[in-house]
Amino acid sequence: VNRNGATLSREASQPYLVRGMVRLIRRLEATGAKVVVMRDQSTAPLTPSDCVARNIHHLRRCAFVPASRRERALELTAARRTGIKAIDAQPMFCSRRLCPAVIGDAIVNKDNYHLTATYSRTLARWMSGQLPAFGG
């Protein structure tokens, strides 16, 4: 975040990011949209699919430590402040200590941040159970 021409640290940026999320949620709700916030996976410090290709017999080398709870709390804070439902998907990607590159038979991330289509499909049933019923 830039404030008055200065680039703020990650920690100093957090209140501004939350305020921006709250404003966005309220703008979306003003249109009549039903809004749900989803906290997603930690950003991988490597490209997991490339790492898996190089370490197919040593997949643990491709795992990484998840972001701290505080780093990941921005979306949940914004949801709490607006009273909307928040879904924490982090447990679908990582344990408390480690984010594996492969879960089941699927590579989780295609790059540092985006899920593979294959792993996304494995989440469909879980996700449908998380979403509130959106009646007419």
Describe the role of every protein-language-model region:
Residues 1-136:
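Extracellular glycan-modifying ectodomains
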